[in-house]
Amino acid sequence: VMNWFRLPEAERPRFVTLYFEFVDTAGHQTGTNSEKLKQELQLADELLGQIMQGVENLDLPITTIITADHGMIDMTSEKGKIIITESLENKLKGKADMINNGMHCQVYLKNKNQKEEVYQEIKQYFAGNSHVKVYKKEETPEKWHYRNHENIGDILIITDAPYYMVKSEKDFLANRKGIWGTHGYDPHTTPEMMAIFYAF
């Protein structure tokens, strides 16, 4: 990065980005209060300090922005917080494909004319579980700005934190031990999803 900034003005990039992936990786693996994450945060801080000192020494009119793409929340494999979707997926086979990432699940209809039928089936499956919400794409909360893109599922299944959807509890628990971290919940209801934004 410093070498780019030292280039002649005509060759110097006008916009440069960096991403420290090791902070996110540690948070996912061991949670937000782990010693591993603290060590990675310290490393990120040291690297950022080197960059900031280098920018200061260059004496160029450079604006620095420090941000994150999301926050993170601690999770456990506590019984009752894991929601199994295998029987729902089997029930919808032939009607829809389900792409599940834990916090939310995208349902893509094979026949758009079956939207209401499939929507009602999903609503019925989660009836009585107040921690799961089911939306038609066009009825998602406006504040999400998540209605118009063609890649968004026809129906969305959303969980409250710290509830988590998995196809098979056995397969999921085999890969999850102790505390781990995740993100993807609604930041309006889960403040841990908020990120930083500093500019100077």
Regions found by a protein language model. Name each.
Residues 2-9, 23-64, 182:
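A long, amphipathic alpha-helix that forms part
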Residues 28-31, 76-79, 168-170:
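Short, solvent-exposed loop/turn and secondary-structure capping segments
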Residues 22-25, 71-73, 161-164:
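Short, solvent-exposed loop/turn segments at secondary-structure junctions
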Residues 13-21, 37-44, 48-51, 62-71, ...:
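Beta-strand elements within well-structured catalytic alpha/beta cores of enzymes
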Residues 1-14, 121-124:
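Feature for exported/extracytoplasmic and membrane-associated proteins, marking the mature portion
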